[in-house]
Amino acid sequence: TVSSFQVDCFLWHVRKRFADQELGDAPFLDRLRRDQKSLRGRGNTLGLDIETATRAGKQIVERILEEESDEALKMPASRYLTDMTLEEMSRDWFMLMPKQKVAGSLSIKMDQAIMDKNITLKANFNVIFDRLETLILLRAFTEEGAIVGEISPLPSLPGHTDEDVKNAIGVLIGGLEWNDNTVRVSEALQRFAWRSSDKNGRPPLPSNQKRKMARTIES
């Protein structure tokens, strides 16, 4: 905690020097002011002097930079992971008992006529820093290959976080399990998006959470 505060103080100082040269835009300056207030509060909580912490942070950053190669300074590129084939992504499907919910910038659809099925969630998405960056499409498949649910970004509301996707997955799972379906999550989704499945890939949702999620779909 102390070393994190020290590094944050030094990086704030670097950004302040940048702003002093009138190079920062309005959002940059706004973040600078907000971060200054935050650092003062953290300094009071930790009982640390900001100026002293800034010097210590400078030493930490300099030590890191001495050990870094130019290759290590490059921003990592995102990876595209695919659970579904192009045919599975582009296939049309219909619902006997359609239910639809908009959660933030994500659309959730499911067929609530589906009962007592084994269902697997598959998705195609981008990953960066070992976390889901952008969901392209998620679909729920029965063992027979039928599509019974879907999560997709809304074109009119771009931008979503991995937490948004996780919440949407929870809503979809809750709605499907309400009808006594067994839902499993693909290995890629377990690793990068859901992160709460058991060893068999089945997300353990308590019954009260299932009911809450099902009501969310119905509303």
Curated annotation (Swiss-Prot):
Post-translational modification (record): Upon interferon induction, ISGylated via host HERC5; this results in the impairment of NS1 interaction with RNA targets due to its inability to form homodimers and to interact with host EIF2AK2/PKR.
Main location: host cell
Coiled coil spans: none
Biased composition annotated in UniProt, kind: Basic residues: 209-219
Ranges spanned by the short sequence motif Nuclear localization signal, renumbered to the chain: 30-34
MF terms in GO: protein serine/threonine kinase inhibitor activity; RNA binding
Keywords for the protein's UniProt record, in alphabetical order: Eukaryotic host gene expression shutoff by virus, Host cytoplasm, Host gene expression shutoff by virus, Host mRNA suppression by virus, Host nucleus, Host-virus interaction, Inhibition of host innate immune response by virus, Inhibition of host interferon signaling pathway by virus, Inhibition of host PKR by virus, Inhibition of host pre-mRNA processing by virus, Inhibition of host RIG-I by virus, Inhibition of host RLR pathway by virus, Interferon antiviral system evasion, RNA-binding, Ubl conjugation, Viral immunoevasion
Annotated motif Nuclear export signal, positions: 128-137
BP-aspect Gene Ontology terms: symbiont-mediated suppression of host cytoplasmic pattern recognition receptor signaling pathway via inhibition of RIG-I activity; symbiont-mediated suppression of host gene expression; symbiont-mediated suppression of host mRNA processing; symbiont-mediated suppression of host PKR/eIFalpha signaling; symbiont-mediated suppression of host type I interferon-mediated signaling pathway
Region named CPSF4-binding: 171-206
Record localization: Host nucleus; Host cytoplasm
GO cellular component terms given for this protein: host cell cytoplasm; host cell nucleus
Spans annotated as Disordered: 196-219
Family: Belongs to the influenza A viruses NS1 family.
Subunit field text: Homodimer. Interacts with host TRIM25 (via coiled coil); this interaction specifically inhibits TRIM25 multimerization and TRIM25-mediated RIGI CARD ubiquitination. Interacts with human EIF2AK2/PKR, CPSF4, IVNS1ABP and PABPN1.
Annotated function: Inhibits post-transcriptional processing of cellular pre-mRNA, by binding and inhibiting two cellular proteins that are required for the 3'-end processing of cellular pre-mRNAs: the 30 kDa cleavage and polyadenylation specificity factor/CPSF4 and the poly(A)-binding protein 2/PABPN1. In turn, unprocessed 3' end pre-mRNAs accumulate in the host nucleus and are no longer exported to the cytoplasm. Cellular protein synthesis is thereby shut off very early after virus infection.
This protein's domain notes: The dsRNA-binding region is required for suppression of RNA silencing.
Full protein name: Non-structural protein 1
Gene source species: Influenza A virus (strain A/Goose/Guangxi/345/2005 H5N1 genotype G)
